Structure formats: structure tokens, C-alpha cells
């Protein structure tokens, strides 16, 4: 019997029909959702395509397992939403480059699976963190997993503002550092398993307090 508030089933079991959205499918991006193929570059390209072509919008992620090995940047007003009988899962591969040592020049002293930024990040550009003017960014109905060998990995960096959220996400931090660094606006139905921390944070973006609803923490080491 489940004795805690979060529910971990997929809340979007059918493919949404949205002619304005983009879909991260093998047909569109030549990827495999098998947990073996590294989809990092294809995923970043898909996110950037939404931003460039629409400026705001949704990238739908079908059920499956998606291996990544580097930070994925999500610019303002872009949402990643999963669908299927089971939630899709993004997996940070074992011993991914850059996740073994503390990042001394970074605000959170870490590297991130997904970093919500204020603007588009092209290859070679320095990311600009989300801020009080970063609206509508989100991730929903997607699970995240950090595999072994990534002690300074954090699943999400979320310093965004109004209408932005994380919802219906289970984060398997394992031996990584944390599930989330820098809170923003709202999180709902998020579960954190393992890690040194579930969440560690500085202040929220100015003017936007944070609401946490129906979330769960288990097995943090600190």
C-alpha cells in the first residue's frame, strides 16, 4: 500500500494531438528510446528547434528510455512533456564526462542533467541561468535517473519564474549529488530518491515565491 502523497503512474497515457507541438520520435530525430543510444545531441537539437521556430511551445517525449551524457539546456517558455503507458525516463549514463568533480566556478558547484536557462544555448555559448523573467518553462510526466559514477550530478536546475513548474517527475538520484538545485515557482508530485540532497537551493527568483505540493523524499545521505 502506498502511504505517501505522490503518484508515480503516467498521467498522459495517450499521445496528445497538438499540431503546434514537436514530438521527439525516431521518425523525426533518428533516435532510439532503448536506453543504449546516446540522444544528447538530438534532444538538444529538438529543444532548440522548438525555440527557434516557435519561440515557445512543447516538445512531447514518448514512452521509452533515453540515455544522455551531457547537460541539456531548456530555454525560456519551452516545456518537455512525456506520454505513454509508462513515463519516459532520461538516464544520465555511467561515468558521464564532467560529472565526477566539483565544478568550482558554478553557482551550485555541480553539473546538471537539465538546466533551465533564460535563453537559447548554442554549442560553445555560455548558458545564462533562468531568472525572474523566465516564464512558462516546464517538465512534466518524465522520470530522471542518475547512474553510478556521477557524484557531482544534479538532475535539474530550475531558477525560473511565473507559470514554470516541475510536475509528475520521479528522480532517482542514486549516488549523485541532488535532484534539484535552485527552486522556482512551483513543483508538484515530485519524488526524490537517494542523493546527498533531494533539493539544495539559494533564493528563488525575485518576486516569485515557491510552492511545493505532494512531494516525497527518501534515502538522502546528508
Predicted regions and their residues:
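Extracellular "leader-to-stem" segments immediately downstream of a signal peptide or signal-anchor
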Residues: 1-60, 68-147, 152-155, 159-167, ...
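Mobile, glycine-rich extracellular loop/lid and propeptide segments
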Residues: 65
Amino acid at each position: 500500500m502506498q502511504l505517501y502523497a505522490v503518484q508515480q503512474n503516467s498521467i498522459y497515457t495517450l499521445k496528445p494531438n497538438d499540431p503546434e507541438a514537436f514530438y521527439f520520435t525516431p521518425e523525426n530525430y533518428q533516435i532510439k528510446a532503448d536506453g543504449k543510444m546516446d540522444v544528447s545531441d538530438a534532444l538538444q537539437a529538438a529543444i532548440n528547434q522548438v525555440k527557434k521556430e516557435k519561440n515557445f511551445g512543447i516538445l512531447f517525449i514518448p514512452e521509452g528510455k533515453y540515455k544522455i551524457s551531457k547537460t541539456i539546456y531548456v530555454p525560456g517558455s519551452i516545456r518537455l512533456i512525456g506520454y505513454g503507458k509508462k513515463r519516459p525516463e532520461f538516464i544520465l549514463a555511467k561515468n558521464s564526462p564532467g560529472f565526477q568533480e566539483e565544478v568550482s566556478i558554478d553557482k551550485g558547484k555541480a553539473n546538471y542533467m537539465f538546466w533551465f536557462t533564460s535563453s537559447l544555448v548554442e554549442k560553445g555559448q555560455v548558458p545564462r541561468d533562468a531568472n525572474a523573467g523566465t516564464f512558462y518553462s516546464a517538465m512534466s510526466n518524465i522520470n530522471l535517473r542518475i547512474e553510478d559514477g556521477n557524484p557531482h550530478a544534479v538532475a535539474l536546475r530550475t531558477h525560473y519564474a511565473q507559470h514554470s513548474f516541475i510536475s509528475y517527475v520521479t528522480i532517482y538520484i542514486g549516488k549523485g549529488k541532488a535532484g534539484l538545485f535552485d527552486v522556482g515557482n512551483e513543483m508538484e508530485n515530485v519524488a526524490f530518491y537517494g542523493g546527498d540532497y533531494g533539493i539544495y537551493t539559494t533564493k528563488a527568483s525575485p518576486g516569485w515565491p515557491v510552492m511545493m505540493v505532494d512531494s516525497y523524499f527518501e534515502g538522502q545521505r546528508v
